[in-house]
Structure formats: C-alpha cells, structure tokens
C-alpha cells in the first residue's frame, strides 16, 4: 500500500500553529511532547482508549508512564488514527518503517516540541487507509460545528456546510442562441444545489447533455451498419473556414424580479466530486443545454451553439444574462447568492463541454477540470480520413449521440410540438457528418475546440486515462499542446479506461482539487506546488510520479525489419463464418488479434535499452496492396507475461468516503496490479488515401508507397527486457467499417520503422 500526496501545502511553524488553533488544538511550545499528544487525542473525535502505544502498553498506560515519546511510538499511534490495524496491517515497533514504506509524510528530525506539533499538523493532512485525509474524516465526525461558514486547513475548505439544509432550485436561463430559428432565444433549464449560507458562494458547474434523461430507443434505431464496404474517394483538397455562430441579444422586457424559485427538485444524478464541494461551500449547477428535456432547441451536438447554451449560465451568474422562474418568462430571478466565479467539472461529454466552454473565454470561468473530454469531435468519430467508432460503440456517430441526448422527445407535449423539426434537422446532421468519405469537413471544423485555444483564460486541469479507448488520449494531448505557452495547466494521467478517479485510495485527488478550487474561486493565494503532469506508473502498484510535460522531443527509430530483405503480408478477407462471428462480438476478434489468430502481420521488437514512451508513436510504412482503396489498422502491445495495472477499478472498501457529514458516501477503489500476458500500449487507424487531414490522394494498385501516421499518445515505461509487438491489419471489428473485400497488403519491413518519442531521465 502506497499513498501519494499532492495536496499538502508547506506551511511555516507560525502558520501551522494558527491553523491548529482554529481546529481547537491550542498548544504552547513550552509543553512537553507527551502533553501535546494527550491533548491532541482528547480534542480529537477518536477513542483514545482503543489505541495501542507500545508492545506492552496502551495509550492511557503510556501517558501515565515515564517512557518518553519517540517517533516509533508516535507512528504506532498515528497509524491507528489513519485506520491501520496494529499487529495485522503493521507490526508494533516497526511503525516508523511501515509509514515510510507507505509514503506517508514524516518529520525527519529529532523529537522536539516544535517538531511534534508539525508532525501532528502534517498528520492531519495525511491520507487514511480508508481514503480521506485525517482532518476531513475528523470534521465529518464532528471536530467542527456545521455553521455554514468557511473553515480552512492547509489551504483546503472543510465540510462545515450543512447538507441537510441544501437549497434545490430549478430555473430557466436565456441563452444567446436560437438553434431552431424560431425567432426566440432558447431557454435552458438548470438545476441548482447550494448550501444555505450568508456567504457569497462560488459554483462548480457540470454541463451534461445526459443529465435530464436519454432516449435509448432512439439511439438504437439510429445506429449505423458497420458491415459496409470502404468508399473509394477522388483526389481533392478539403477547404474549411473558421467561424462561430452569432450570439443573439435578448429582447429587453421589464419583469418582476423575485429572489426565490418556485420550482424545486429532489432527485437526480450528481457527480460525487461536486457533492464533496457542496459541503465545503461551493454551489453545484447542472445544465443539459439545448435540445434537452424542458429546454428549447435542437441537440446540435458539440458545436458552439451547444457550448453557448452552457456558458449562458456563467453569464447569468455574473449578471450578463437573464434567468426566469418558469418557461413562461413571467418573473426574472438573479443569482444574488453567487460570487460569480465558476469551475466546470465532469467526465466524457461533460468534460467535453468544459473544453468547449473554456475556448469561448467567458468571463467568470476561472478553471476547468476536464476528465476524459473530447477536444475535437472529428477525432472521436473519425481518424485520418476513416470512419472510426469509439471503443466499445461500433456504429455510433454524432447523429446517434444527438438522438440519444435529444431528451425533449421524452415529454409527450414537446414531442408533439417539436419532433417534426427534430427529424428534419437530424437528417441534415446525418448528411453533413459524411460517413461515406470519413473526411474532415466544415461540420467537423465547427466542432473542433482546438482552433480556439488562444481564447482560453481559465486554468486547465486535465484528467485522462491512458487506457481509455472510448475518448482516446489524443483528446487530452492535443488540448494540452494547443494551449498557449505558459498557460496554467496540469494533467493527471492514470492507467484506467473511461473512469473517474476522485475516490481512489492511492492519491489525494479530491483534496488536491479542493486546494486549487479554493484558491481560484475564493480569491485566496494558490500555494499548491503542483507539477505539470502527475502520472500513474504502468507497472507498479499505487505509484504516482511527477513529469514536466506530456510529449517528449527526443525520438528513437526502431526498424521493423530484421534483415536487409524482409516482408510481411496479410489478407483482409474472412470466410463467412468467421466474419459473422467477429461481427457479432468484437471482443472475440480482439482476443484472436492479440493472440495472432486473425488476419494480421505481427512484428516483435526488442528494445535497445530501458525507455519511457512519452507522446504519440509514429509508424512509417512502405507498402502496397492490390486495390485502389484501403485502410490500415495498427496496435502495439507490451507483450509477455508480467504484472501490469488493470484498466478497471476494484472496490477496496464500500461506502467509506464521506463527502460531508454522513453525506453521499462513496466506495474506495483502486486499479489492481495483476499478471497478464500482454497490455495494449497504443493503437491507430488511417485511410490510405488520406496522407494528411486536408488532402485526399489517389491510390494505385500494386505500387509501392510510403505512409506515415501517428498512433494514440501515451506515457509508458518499458524495461530493456520487455518486448513490443506491432500488429498490422485492416478491418477492426470494434472500430472500423467491416470491409470484407479480398485485398492483400504487403509491407516492406526493411524500409519501415517505428518512431518513438522517449522521455529523458531528467524529466
């Protein structure tokens, strides 16, 4: 078990004393160490009679004895306060060593009054075995009163806002878009959950088109057939222009202003990180945007009309937009309780909306926490001129997602009024996204946030799984690289798939975000010493490390051929039985592919030395095929039996993370380290007619040509004895169209190479 603390802010001794005093620990430097220990335990909500101090004495007996307090005894007691079990989790008498091996913060100096006070200060900042830092656990147990005012410790807000007194309001914000050209600004329903307090509150906002309901049946009916032939394209250049939808002014009309919303709500999905912040004095707002239940408009899916319908909420919080108590617009309501500062949170589509909102430069958006977000929708549904479904969702496209999230149709009255217009616009979207060619076009350009990163004012916190094949790592990498030099940004890169990481045992993620949000949203100094990149190592249990950048400038080139004359070949076509089997379950295909049982070329590469991949691996291939259209798929495995982290979390302990005071309990989870025969490092796909994003070229049958394309970026450490397996093939039954033509691909390995960006030891 290893704990990684990134949230701890260094404080000088006077600051430590002042903060301890605020918690009720009022000590003098003239006290001896045992007196301070005794008072610490008395003031805490822990049961000191249950604690063991030495191999022979419990704490009560130790405090009465003449034995001096030393660091070994300190850690015997401290580990128990951190929920470790003596004689089972750790051995009494070896507690100091156990704490050090667990990477717990320690004072490495002689035992003095000042040092013991500092040790208790940092112990309160330390993560418990069950996932909360000690001070937060004790506050949830009643160390401080629920007075609905801010209390801070180590630059973090504590849970002193009463979750039983939360206000839950429903409002409609006037957006600056008219997505169906009705001649009226679209109204957007929002749900607010906020502590009852006289303080001016900041907002943690989650923009989720899923939030008010999804239409699974419409989604399933809209899915595209993947068993189609690849289209041949004529050579041409693609032209796009940078344009944004015009923001509409609201029609000025004097209305009565009220300070209370008549509509309330009780239930609904909430993000547990937002719940955590609710009890620490941050309001939560959930907004689903245009084309969703009880709002106006069409589900425009990813364009800036949708983004503006989200940022309208930030405008309202800052007095630049209007909100109403109902869709009838009879009464206006103002955000008199808000301080105007906003952070956006959420994973997947939710993180996507955060990326998009940041690129508008909207005033009041102080930072985004974008988890597994999409920075360019083309790269989610397409790749290098090829239709490419996101991992796990063959047949999905942006029109399918629109059908899923156009939740207005879930209400019968809205269905009657709006379905005909919706069907017309959905058909237009299906045509515009152009599944036949797979090429970039104006439709996708309008949904590319990367071209507007120069407008970003908010600090950017990125969370992404390097084993996420749904929203692939390039979405985070490209946004990271597109931000202007010197922009405030940090990335948490974990080894999971498409998952949240705010309830993991090994890292104090929520507390780190707490310190950042407090500084940016409550106008306090940002003293958090956070590295640019926080990386979970790929072959070690519960180990996180710091890096300077995502993407390295140094490269090595590994030839794919082992001799001067070296060729590989694979066929595209499968017999009917195999084709049907793979089409029915792409997981069967993936297993066969990784075990060299599919139509593929396999190249095993030895490494010249230990190395860490950092960035997108590039393939440079010399090949030919007996057709005038074709596509290539590539996957690279870390091949060979060894221990690796799984990409899905397992529960370590149920309902032990208290998000407030007996409020919204969460499971404690972690990625397990397990034996496996291989692990996917990266993958990529390309249409052989698309040598670049905006150029389509002719392909001549039976003629050799060279193509270069990047695979998904990653950071992955390999030892010299490890082996990389490169798999080259065409049809991928999870991602690509299932083109079963009889095409043979031949690769000249002697003129082909793998180009790997590698990390320097210094970084």
From Swiss-Prot:
Keywords from the UniProt entry: Aminopeptidase, Cytoplasm, Hydrolase, Protease, Serine protease
Gene Ontology CC terms, in alphabetical order: cytoplasm
Gene3D superfamilies from the UniProt entry: 1.10.246.70, alpha/beta hydrolase, Galactose-binding domain-like
Compartment(s) of residence: Cytoplasm
Chief location of this protein within or outside the cell: cytoplasm
Gene Ontology biological-process entries: proteolysis
EC number, UniProt record: 3.4.14.11
EC primary class: hydrolase
InterPro entries named in the record: AB_hydrolase_fold, Galactose-bd-like_sf, Pept_S15_Xpro, PepX_N_dom, PepX_N_dom_sf, Xaa-Pro-like_dom, Xaa-Pro_dipept_C, Xaa-Pro_dipeptidyl-ppase/CocE
Keyword Transcription recorded: no
Keyword Cytoplasm assigned: yes
Reactions accelerated catalytically: Hydrolyzes Xaa-Pro-|- bonds to release unblocked, N-terminal dipeptides from substrates including Ala-Pro-|-p-nitroanilide and (sequentially) Tyr-Pro-|-Phe-Pro-|-Gly-Pro-|-Ile
GO molecular function, a single term: dipeptidyl-peptidase activity
Active site (record annotation): 348 (charge relay system), 468 (charge relay system), 498 (charge relay system)
Family matches, as HAMAP family: Aminopeptidase_S15 (MF_00698)
Family membership: Belongs to the peptidase S15 family.
Quaternary structure and interacting proteins, as annotated: Homodimer.
NCBIfam families: PRK05371.1-4
Role played: Removes N-terminal dipeptides sequentially from polypeptides having unsubstituted N-termini provided that the penultimate residue is proline.
Protein name stated in the entry: Xaa-Pro dipeptidyl-peptidase
Gene (name only): pepX
